[in-house]
Curated annotation (Swiss-Prot):
Pfam families: Ribosomal_S8 (PF00410). Keywords: Ribonucleoprotein, Ribosomal protein, RNA-binding, rRNA-binding. Gene3D superfamilies: 3.30.1370.30, 3.30.1490.10. Part of the 30S ribosomal subunit. Contacts proteins S5 and S12. One of its GO terms (cellular component) is ribosome. GO terms for molecular function: rRNA binding; structural constituent of ribosome. This is Small ribosomal subunit protein uS8. GO terms for biological process: translation. One of the primary rRNA binding proteins, it binds directly to 16S rRNA central domain where it helps coordinate assembly of the platform of the 30S subunit.
């Protein structure tokens, strides 16, 4: 069975893993997923991730991050732009998510980046997801 939205599947697996208090979560790998994980790692929402090969299929395993008292580092993670309804935004239209405590992840002509990095580079693009 083929999936229509691989990114939404990845975000759902991460969200469910945090709710279940898991240490790691794995899913099939792709370039866009790796780019999103780079942003999440750079912003401090996940510890690390590793891509491995099993039977000619590449999988990504993500090490989830928790605080000292066991709280998840991601409270909310939602898909914004979907295959049936793409959402694009100019950088001036992106306001801070949760009073700048959360981030939007954008796909821009310069690659996948957070809204903070997009503000610095003054570039807009497709809003992939929002994280808090």
């Amino acid at each position: 069975m083929s999936m229509t939205d691989n990114v939404a599947d990845m975000l759902t697996r991460i969200r469910n893993a945090y709710k279940s208090k898991l240490i790691n979560v794995s899913f099939p790998s792709s370039k866009i997923k790796t780019s999103i994980l780079d942003v999440l790692q750079k912003e401090g929402y996940i510890k690390d991730y590793v891509t491995t090969q099993k039977n000619n299929i590449s999988y990504t395993e993500v090490a989830l991050k928790y605080s000292v008292n066991g709280d998840a580092s991601i409270c909310e993670i939602h898909r914004v732009s979907k295959p049936g309804k793409r959402v694009y935004s100019a950088i001036k239209d992106l306001k801070g998510y949760y009073n700048n405590m959360g981030i939007y992840i954008l796909s821009t002509p310069y690659g996948v980046m957070s809204d903070r990095e997009a503000h610095i580079k003054n570039v807009g693009g497709e809003v992939i997801c929002k994280v808090f």
